[in-house]
């Protein structure tokens, strides 16, 4: 059974720049005007990452555009947003992030079946330049393979 996801924003650069070792889902604390802006698809998580502050996890650099029909008390576009996770998950994440070279990256933001905004996070390790070149070669080879199969 496939799970319903209405994708709002994706971070395609994260897959290119990092080895994603583990994926997890988290809720996010939002204001009303932010939700309305997300329904219009006006969000970007290209440069966003998550970090811990004690025993909470926040999402940084996530851009949600201002909702044009909101009043003068609109939200700030790049404010840190709290992620909703279970305590065991937070402890596990903090343990993994504290290891040198690991980071917590936002991979996608979407509405789930109950119309709640969720963020897919990935515990990731940065790629070196030669790893990025290998992934480019692999992507080109897959593209060439599909062309050869179509020609036959």
UniProtKB/Swiss-Prot annotation:
The organism named in the record is Rickettsia akari (strain Hartford)
Q: Name one GO biological process term.
A: trans-translation
This protein's record includes keyword Nucleotide-binding: no
Cross-referenced CDD domains, in alphabetical order? SmpB
* Biological role stated in the UniProt entry: Required for rescue of stalled ribosomes mediated by trans-translation. Binds to transfer-messenger RNA (tmRNA), required for stable association of tmRNA with ribosomes. tmRNA and SmpB together mimic tRNA shape, replacing the anticodon stem-loop with SmpB. tmRNA is encoded by the ssrA gene; the 2 termini fold to resemble tRNA(Ala) and it encodes a 'tag peptide', a short internal open reading frame. During trans-translation Ala-aminoacylated tmRNA acts like a tRNA, entering the A-site of stalled ribosomes, displacing the stalled mRNA.
Disulfide bond as UniProt keyword: no
User: What protein does this entry describe?
Assistant: SsrA-binding protein
Q: Taxonomic classification, please?
A: Bacteria, Pseudomonadati, Pseudomonadota, Alphaproteobacteria, Rickettsiales
Q: Which family does it belong to?
A: Belongs to the SmpB family.
One Pfam entry name? SmpB
């Amino acid at each position: 059974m496939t799970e319903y996801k209405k994708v709002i924003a994706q971070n395609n650069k994260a897959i290119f720049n990092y080895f994603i070792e583990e994926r997890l889902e988290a809720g996010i604390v939002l204001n009303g005007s932010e939700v309305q802006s997300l329904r219009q698809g006006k969000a970007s998580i290209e440069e966003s990452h998550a970090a811990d502050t004690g025993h909470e996890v926040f999402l940084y650099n996530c851009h949600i555009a201002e909702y044009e029909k909101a009043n003068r008390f609109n939200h700030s576009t790049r404010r840190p947003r709290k992620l909703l996770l279970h305590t065991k998950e937070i402890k596990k994440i903090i343990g993994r992030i504290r290891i040198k070279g690991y980071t917590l990256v936002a991979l996608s933001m979407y509405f789930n079946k109950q119309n709640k905004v969720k963020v897919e996070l990935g515990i990731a390790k940065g790629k070196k330049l030669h790893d990025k070149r290998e992934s480019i070669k692999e992507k080109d080879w897959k593209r060439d393979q599909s062309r050869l199969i179509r020609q036959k």
